[in-house]
């Protein structure tokens, strides 16, 4: 947990006598929250007329109203509001929010989240172990409880299919577990096909975690893989996208994290997956909710509190939903004795809720950090002193000159393998299109709704790998869009209708050492600079959210049919059916490279 002194809480083992004295009224509490209804995540009930006694950043007791007779304790009047445990997000990627861990903390606490379990495979793919450890140092200084699920699949596939900046081998992963107490689990094992097929490296990574008693998080598509996946030691996944696979996973002993996200993004699988409970009758006891990926704007507007309310919207009782958002995530990682509930001895990570489960105020380690939906001075001070990443993190975009960004125009009839983009943007279709000889590319674009897509290796590990492709149905009619957040190897992906605008976009990203941008008529019309590893801004979350909002407006004006976070997934070579990396077009079911054109 955070090592920031102002928010640190002593281990329970050193506080038992103190807490027992406070609970028995032999010692004054530091803080008493009065006039509250308590949401018990243990019994899943609302308890009227309660007060919460806090000492040393921990809960001493929850008592009937009027139990505190007066003394030196600070009093807080909840005015009939709901006091609940802070939310626990069991699966997120901080880097998707494009902010540092310190900046992320502000948005999390505003939304009532006090603990997160972060898989930092994004920065691991760029900077290897050094990136993961820099993120851990950032997390240690952030005013939030941040635990690491060690990245398990870096790179996502093999060097034959893509070039990554990092390579987290079984030995490196084992060393991270041994060095960092915050490393509590193995992050999502995305290579579910190699796991199911018994791949040696994949299972050596599993052994590095399981041999140390660490749980393993997963990522699996396809009911046919569930049995082998569970048998390999994977015990949670956030990729339960419908009630069928969710039911299979629960029966196989795998926790499921219902992922909720704005409908315009690829992340909103909760409405379908929750039907394993509401329609098939499964218990919710091994079900939690998570956010997975959020940009900075959506992080503020659609936090884990919103996902919890979505669970209510789709059939759960409020008490059940809040338990899924707090206690269940804690229990999955064996931390229910520390967080996730209001039991005696637990950390005083609390949230005051309105009747519709909207966070109003937040306490972190017994300190009031959000009051009436505004951050307090103690939190503002902590946020104003962020961790400084190593200098190497600011120099990760390494591009050769004179890159060829578009394919040659075919001079004979060919069959083109195109990438079909459809909402919400997770899976991409493999569509072949016959291209007859034409005077220019625009004729093909107009006839088949195509545009260029190019991936450029940016880690300085190749002689400048550049792969060309064609997007089908992306909607871009002019200009270019580009990003240094091309999952998961985070090479640069640029789409456009002409090489000149694509080059302007690439130059802008190189100049800022990372970012996402839109270019029209040779000018950058919107950009979110990401100078840290080409993934993160060094600004506060509200500043980045404003930049993201402006980017989205220009993105829509350009005609793009999928949001930029979906665009960032186009190189993700572990999700069907077809992807593009710096090595070329990847046919995911076969895990082979395909040429862009074949003779008709």
Swiss-Prot record:
Enzyme Commission numbers on file: 3.5.4.2
GO molecular function per UniProt: adenine deaminase activity
Gene3D superfamilies found in the cross-reference section: Metal-dependent hydrolases, Urease, subunit C, domain 1
Cited InterPro entries: Adenine_deam (IPR006679), Adenine_deam_C (IPR026912), Amidohydro-rel (IPR006680), Metal-dep_hydrolase_composite (IPR011059), Metal_Hydrolase (IPR032466)
Designated gene of the protein: ade3
Keywords assigned: Hydrolase, Manganese, Plasmid
CC cofactor: Mn(2+)
Class of this enzyme: hydrolase
Example of a GO biological process term: adenine catabolic process
Organism: Rhizobium johnstonii (strain DSM 114642 / LMG 32736 / 3841)
Catalytic activity, as annotated: adenine + H2O + H(+) = hypoxanthine + NH4(+)
Segments forming a coiled coil: none
Record-given protein name: Adenine deaminase 3
Family per record: Belongs to the metallo-dependent hydrolases superfamily. Adenine deaminase family.
SUPFAM superfamilies: Composite domain of metallo-dependent hydrolases (SSF51338), Metallo-dependent hydrolases (SSF51556)
């Amino acid at each position: 947990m955070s090592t920031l002194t102002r928010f640190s809480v002593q281990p329970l083992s050193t506080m038992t006598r103190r807490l027992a004295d406070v609970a028995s009224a032999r010692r004054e509490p530091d803080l008493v929250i009065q006039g509250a209804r308590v949401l018990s995540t243990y019994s899943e009930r609302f308890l009227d007329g309660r007060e919460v006694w806090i000492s040393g950043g921990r809960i001493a007791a929850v008592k009937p109203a009027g139990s505190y007779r007066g003394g030196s304790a600070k009093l807080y009047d909840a005015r009939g509001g709901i006091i609940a445990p802070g939310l626990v997000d069991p699966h997120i990627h901080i880097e998707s929010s494009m902010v540092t861990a310190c900046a992320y903390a502000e948005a999390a606490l505003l939304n009532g989240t006090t603990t997160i379990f972060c898989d930092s495979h994004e920065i691991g793919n760029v900077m290897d172990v050094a990136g993961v450890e820099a993120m851990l140092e950032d997390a240690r200084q952030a005013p939030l409880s941040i635990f690491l699920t060690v990245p398990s699949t870096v790179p996502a596939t093999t060097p034959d299919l893509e070039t990554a900046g990092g390579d987290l081998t079984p030995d490196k992963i084992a060393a991270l577990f041994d060095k960092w107490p915050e490393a509590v689990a193995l992050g999502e094992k995305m290579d579910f096909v190699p796991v199911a097929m018994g791949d040696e490296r994949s299972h050596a990574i599993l052994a590095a975690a399981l041999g140390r008693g660490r749980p393993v998080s997963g990522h699996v598509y396809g009911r046919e893989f569930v049995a082998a996946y569970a048998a390999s030691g994977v015990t949670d996944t956030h990729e339960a996208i419908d009630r069928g696979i969710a039911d299979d996973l629960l029966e196989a002993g795998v926790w499921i994290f219902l992922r909720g996200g704005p409908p315009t993004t690829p992340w909103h699988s909760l409405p379908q997956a929750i039907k394993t409970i509401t329609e098939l009758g499964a218990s919710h006891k091994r079900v939690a909710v998570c956010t997975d990926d959020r940009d900075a704007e959506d992080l503020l507007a659609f936090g884990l509190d919103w996902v919890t309310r979505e669970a209510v919207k789709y059939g759960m009782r409020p008490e059940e939903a809040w338990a899924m958002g707090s206690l269940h995530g804690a229990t999955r990682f064996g931390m229910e004795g520390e967080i996730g509930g209001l039991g005696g001895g637990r950390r005083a990570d609390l949230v005051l809720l309105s009747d519709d489960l909207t966070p109003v105020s937040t306490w972190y380690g017994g300190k009031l950090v959000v009051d009436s939906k505004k951050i307090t001075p103690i939190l503002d001070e902590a946020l104003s002193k962020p961790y400084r990443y190593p200098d190497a993190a600011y120099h990760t975009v390494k591009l050769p000159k004179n890159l060829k960004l578009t394919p040659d125009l075919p001079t004979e009839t060919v069959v083109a393998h195109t990438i079909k983009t459809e909402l919400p943007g997770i899976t991409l279709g493999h569509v072949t299109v016959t291209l007859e000889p034409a005077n220019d590319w625009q004729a093909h674009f107009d006839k088949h709704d195509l545009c260029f897509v190019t991936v450029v290796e940016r880690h300085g590990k190749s002689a400048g790998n550049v792969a060309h492709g064609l997007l089908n149905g992306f909607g871009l009619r002019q200009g270019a869009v580009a990003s240094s957040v091309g999952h998961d190897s985070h090479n640069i992906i640029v789409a456009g209708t002409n090489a000149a605008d694509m080059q302007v976009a690439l130059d802008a990203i190189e100049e800022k050492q990372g970012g996402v941008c839109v270019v029209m008529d040779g000018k950058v019309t919107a950009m979110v600079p990401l100078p840290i590893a080409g993934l993160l801004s060094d600004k506060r979350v509200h500043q980045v959210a404003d930049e993201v909002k402006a980017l989205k407006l220009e993105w829509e004006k350009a005609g793009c049919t999928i949001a930029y976070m979906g665009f960032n997934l186009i190189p993700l070579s572990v999700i069907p059916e077809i992807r593009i990396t710096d090595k070329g077009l990847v046919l995911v079911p076969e895990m082979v490279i395909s040429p862009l054109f074949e003779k008709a």
